[in-house]
Amino acid sequence: LSYTNILNMIDLAEIPVMASERGETEPLVIAGGPTAISPEPLADFIDLFLIGDGEESLPHLVELWKGMNQKKLSRKEKIVSLAQTLKNVYAPSLYEVIYHQDNTIQEIRPRISGLPSPIRSASVRDLNKTYFPTKPIVPYVKTIHDRITIEVMRGCTQGCRFCQSGMSKRPTRPRTVENIINLAELCYANTGHNEISLASLSISDYPSLKRLMEEMNRIFIPRHVNISFPSLRVNE
C-alpha cells in the first residue's frame, strides 16, 4: 500500500521517477527490506534492489560505489559492476522477465554475462555481531512507536506457509541474553523511553525467554520501564 509513497518520494526529490530516464548526474535509487523480496512491481522505478539482510551487504555496496566514483565509469557501468560483484543485488534493467499467460513469472534471464541467476538473499549469520542503532532520534512529538525496539531473534521456528517473513528469514538466529540486555541499557540511557519492545516474529519461541525476562525485570522494574511483547502466538 506504500508503493505510491515511494514514487512520490522520488518525485519530491526531483529525481526522474522512471529508472530509464535517469542521467549521469542522478543518484542511485536503491530499495531493500522485506518488500524487496518481490521486486517486480517496482522494477521500472528502482535502479538496484538489495535482497535480504542489509546490515552487512549495504555497507559493502556503499564502499564499492565510493571506489567507483574515483574511476571514469558511466552510471550504467557502475550498475553493471555492482550487479556482477554482489550476488544479492538485482538490477532490473539488466534482466529480462518472461511471463506465463496468466501473468505469473516464468523466468528471469540476465541480459549480459556475469550476472547472478538466481539472485541469492543475503543472510546475517550472527545478529550479535551486527550494527544496531543505540542512539535513535527522539522525536519532539508523540509517535505511534514511542518506545525502544530490540530485535531479539530473526526468523521463526513455526514455518507457517502463508508467512513471507517466516519463510524468507530462515534460519532462526537469536541474540544472546547478554547482547539484548546491553542494547536495552544503551538505548535507554540515550533515549529515556519508558517502554522496551522485544521484537520477533514469535517472541514466545525465543529459546532463553525466561532468563531474559528475569534479567530485564531486575534491571528495568526499578526504573519504571515497561516491557512489551508485540508478537505472541494466540496458543502460547
Q: Could you describe each region identified by the protein language model?
A:
Residues 186-236:
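Conserved SAM/AdoMet-binding glycine-rich loop
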Residues 47, 156, 160, 180, ...:
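Conserved, mostly hydrophobic/aromatic
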Residues 138-161, 188:
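N-terminal pre-triad scaffold of radical SAM enzymes
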Residues 31, 51, 165, 198-200, ...:
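Conserved beta-strand positions
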Residues 163-179:
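Iron-sulfur (Fe-S) cluster-binding segments and ferredoxin-like electron-carrier domains
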Residues 86, 127, 145-149, 157, ...:
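Active-site lining segments that contact anionic ligands and/or coordinate catalytic metals
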Residues 92, 98, 102-149:
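N-terminal [4Fe-4S]-dependent radical SAM core
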Residues 1-110:
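Glycine-rich beta-alpha loop elements in corrinoid/cobalamin-binding modules
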